[in-house]
Design a protein with these regions (language model features):
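Short, Lys/Arg-enriched anionic-surface-contact patches
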Residues: 5-31
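Amphipathic alpha-helical segments within well-ordered protein domains
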Residues: 30-33, 45
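Internal amphipathic alpha-helical segments of the cytochrome P450 catalytic fold
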Residues: 41-42, 55
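Short alpha-helical "recognition helix" segments of helix-turn-helix
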Residues: 42-48
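Major-groove recognition helix of helix-turn-helix-like DNA-binding domains
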Residues: 52-66
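Short Lys/Arg-enriched helix C-cap and helix-to-coil transition segments
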Residues: 62-78
Length: 78
């Protein structure tokens, strides 16, 4: 994972409200899906210091991004 992206995601997650952590994780996974396409969910969690169970959420959001983009989402605006 790119060091800059890793730090941006860490910052976003650490500044998310306690009840908004999962939503922020989803948002960051979608935002950087293209850049993170070559890493596994396990690697994602390890690099960010997250529990391995969050890898499932990362994978779901990365897979969902293709459909969201087809519907008009511009991830650069997130």
């Amino acid at each position: 994972m790119n060091k800059v992206i890793r730090e941006k995601i860490k910052q976003a997650l650490s500044s998310a409200p306690r009840n908004g952590f999962m939503a922020e994780l989803h948002l960051q996974s979608i935002k950087y899906a293209d850049e993170l396409g070559n890493i596994t969910a396990r690697e994602f969690c390890e690099e960010l210091g997250l529990k391995p169970s969050y890898g499932t959420e990362f994978s779901k959001m990365r897979n969902l991004t293709t459909r969201l983009k087809a519907a008009g989402l511009v991830t650069e605006k997130i």
